[in-house]
């Protein structure tokens, strides 16, 4: 049974510059499935469409962003949601936080600087379930954060009194207060030192193991995916380049872009300079024809410049969009 099924999703930003209107094709024909009880990673360079994708699948579709085509369907144990056609009222009352929660990039974006952490918990919970017994609520929140490894004192603190790592842990605790079926984490380790990153990732893994929910982890850091994710999707210029179990992505990458991402990771004991990828990501308001990676690809063929490669299944749970793979050249 799938938790989320995304089919042929196209989500564009409508922009206007110098009197000319145009579409920025941030997500362009994306299809994938999420299953219960897994950690699914989404990786790629800045401006590849990662954040736009999670905006759409979480129902945060506001101008200038518009979903033009495709479907985003959830199945929460029989409660089915069509995210592209759900009303804002139903989304707020029945889906956000209760079924889908969102750990935003940068914990200070979530926490109100003039309210104590407990008050922020109250604001979220009271939106869905009327708090009638404050003492019982306090005890429930104490148990919740202690279970996640946070001290009780955090509840009585203001955000500025906490370290960056502690604030990020609080943001994750807020996202899990209703034990939702899907947790979307957008760059949860950004701006944290490596020791704190390890603690945050350990917390995410523990939550998923305890609650058996699904985590959609979005980060450009391939090392994070290597340590946490069960499956990884590689995005490039608004499209899926490759999707596979984490072990396959790292040990047998098929797409040239995925190969570059893996080869760019530092290796302990080796001091050689890593080869950089020529060029820059394309302008999504005027993307190149054919495969969008072809201007930077070291293996480019004539077909790559004119024909969009299909996302094909090469073996179980391993999909790739590359003419070279189809031809058996990689």
Task: Specify the residue positions occupied by each region the protein language model found.
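ABC transporter nucleotide-binding domains
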Residues: 1-251, 320, 326-330
């Amino acid at each position: 049974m799938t938790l989320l099924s995304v089919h042929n999703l196209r989500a564009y930003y409508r922009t206007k510059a110098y009197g000319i209107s145009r579409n920025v094709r941030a997500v362009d024909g994306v299809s994938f499935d999420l299953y219960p009880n897994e950690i699914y990673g989404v990786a790629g360079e800045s401006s590849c469409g990662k954040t736009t994708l999670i905006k759409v699948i979480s129902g945060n579709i506001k101008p200038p962003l518009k979903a033009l085509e495709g479907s985003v369907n959830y199945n929460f144990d029989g409660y089915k949601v069509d995210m592209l056609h759900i009303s804002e009222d139903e989304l707020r009352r029945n889906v956000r936080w209760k079924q889908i929660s969102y750990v935003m990039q940068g914990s200070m974006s979530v926490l109100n600087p003039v309210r104590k952490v407990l008050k922020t918990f109250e604001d979220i919970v009271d939106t869905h379930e009327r708090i009638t017994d404050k003492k019982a609520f306090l005890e429930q929140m104490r148990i919740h954060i202690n279970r996640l490894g946070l001290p009780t004192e955090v509840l009585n603190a203001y955000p500025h009194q906490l370290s960056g790592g502690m604030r990020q842990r609080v943001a994750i605790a807020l996202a899990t207060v209703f034990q939702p079926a899907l947790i979307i984490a957008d760059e949860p380790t950004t701006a944290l030192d490596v020791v704190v990153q390890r603690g945050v990732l350990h917390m995410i893994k523990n939550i998923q193991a305890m609650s058996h929910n699904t985590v959609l982890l979005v980060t450009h850091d391939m090392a994070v995916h290597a340590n946490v994710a069960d499956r990884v999707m590689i995005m490039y210029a608004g499209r899926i380049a490759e999707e596979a179990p984490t072990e396959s992505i790292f040990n047998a990458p098929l797409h040239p872009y995925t190969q570059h991402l893996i080869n760019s990771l530092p290796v302990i004991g080796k001091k050689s300079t890593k080869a950089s990828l020529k060029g820059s990501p394309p302008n999504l308001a005027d993307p190149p024809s054919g495969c969008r990676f072809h201007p930077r690809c070291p293996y480019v063929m004539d077909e790559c410049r004119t024909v969009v490669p299909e996302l094909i299944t090469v073996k179980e749970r391993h999909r790739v969009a590359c003419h070279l793979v189809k031809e058996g050249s990689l």
